[in-house]
Regions:
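Mature extracytoplasmic or organellar-lumen-exposed domains after removal of signal/transit peptides
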Residues: 43-409
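Sec-dependent signal peptide recognition
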Residues: 1-4
């Protein structure tokens, strides 16, 4: 019994060995192959020219004769509004019908100013110009012809004691040719440039035609159209600034071709001489050139960027000059130089009217129509109007405009 048990126990303790062998197993490997493919894409790159010159098939596509005509009309109307021989019928025809000018080319141009005044804003602005024409020709001019000396509440002519200046004014001291001509700088030129021809609504309305290269306008003397609507709209905006000056360079051209102080570009170049705005004429000119090149390249984002530059920079002319002439008038009143003071106040009045057509960096005008009217009412308050103003009042108003525009010389 004992022997058998021992055998069983020994059998239970026997060790089992495990044999390991190397076995070849197939492995699937995934390899990514990078393939480089060259894709050619045509991109229009905007390269603005150094001068405002654009051609197609060897023919110029720049065309703004209508704007040049209107600027010449503005100059002639300014002169007529200082001529006591002018009649209401004559000046009204010049302004509203585009006739009655000594320059026959203007009479036959088919252009006029009246229907282009203040078109982007309140309908109450254009009638002001008609009222000024009526008042000068029916009240001021007859008073001057009758040798009436102007004073508070009395229309006529007023000459500085030293004979340096004579102004022809209404009963409130308004020198109406200055109010009208400076008013046109904002309500005609700035408004047409910023709020009409360079507006995104106007330009984008011609986008499809520009994309499809559909030409609508011939260059002068050509029967074949070479110009798209959008190109022409941009040129018209350019023409309202540069129409009496050199197309191929910023700044002022030869005065012999009709340039006058009734012109926006004339005052822009005055601003260019200020320390803070040196180079503003070239900035605006280059923006016009770059924007036009962008239209040719169909780069509308770049076009809009340049339009914004033009709007903001051009508006500075109205912003600076509106406050400048208020301060100038304050100084002249302080010296008792009333002819100079009335002249400066008329210029201030016209420029303030234009503030509603400006475009600040935020896209809004410096002043709304209502805010402009508040300033104009303050400036003309009382029976004596300009005659009643004090240096303190004018300085306060200039300070307010400086704050509204963010501009200081």
């Amino acid at each position: 019994m004992t022997l058998l048990l021992s055998i069983i126990l020994l059998a239970s303790c026997t060790k089992t060995e495990i044999e390991y062998r190397d076995v070849e197993v197939p492995v699937e490997t995934i390899v990514e192959k990078i393939v480089t493919q060259t894709v050619t894409q045509t991109v229009n790159v905007v390269t603005p020219p150094e001068e405002y010159s654009f051609t197609r098939n060897g023919v110029s596509t720049v065309y703004y004769t209508g704007q040049s005509a209107r600027l010449k009309m503005a100059t002639a109307i300014k002169s007529a509004m200082n001529d006591q021989a002018s009649t209401k019928t004559n000046v009204d025809n010049m302004f509203n019908n585009g006739t009655g000018f000594s320059d026959e080319s203007l009479n036959s141009s088919g252009k006029k100013i009246g229907n282009k005044v203040g078109t982007s804003g309140s309908a109450t602005v254009k009638p002001l110009f008609d009222e000024w024409i009526t008042e000068f020709t029916t009240i001021v001019a007859p008073a001057v012809n009758n040798s009436i000396t102007a004073t508070r509440t009395i229309a006529g002519s007023y000459t500085e004691a030293d004979g340096s200046r004579t102004v022809k004014v209404n009963a409130k001291g308004f020198e109406l040719n200055q109010i009208l001509s400076k008013g046109l700088i904002g309500a005609l030129q700035v408004d047409q440039i910023i709020n009409t021809y360079l507006s995104f609504t106007k330009l984008d309305g011609a986008k499809q035609d520009n994309d499809d290269d559909i030409y609508h306008y011939p260059t002068d003397g050509s029967a074949v159209p070479y110009i798209t609507k959008m190109e022409h709209y941009w040129d018209e905006g350019f023409g309202y600034l540069q129409g009496l000056d050199n197309q191929y360079a910023p700044g002022l051209g030869d005065a012999s071709i009709g340039r006058d102080g009734a012109n926006l570009n004339y005052y822009l170049n005055k601003i260019n001489g200020q320390e803070k705005e040196v180079g503003i004429t070239k900035r605006i000119y280059d923006a016009f050139s770059a924007g036009r090149a962008a239209i040719v390249a169909k780069d509308y984002e770049e076009r809009d960027r340049q339009a914004n530059i033009i709007g903001v920079e051009l508006s500075k002319v109205i912003g600076y000059k509106s406050q400048y002439y208020l301060r100038s008038a304050a100084g002249k009143i302080g010296k008792g130089e009333w002819a100079d003071a009335l002249h400066a106040l008329a210029e201030a009045y016209g420029f303030i009217l234009g503030l509603q057509y400006t475009k600040a960096a935020d896209g809004q005008p410096y002043l709304t129509h209502a805010e402009v009217n508040e300033h104009l009412s303050s400036l003309s308050a009382g029976d004596g109007g300009f005659w009643d103003r004090t240096p303190a009042e004018l300085t306060t108003m200039a300070d307010q405009l400086q704050q509204s525009t963010g501009l200081s010389e």
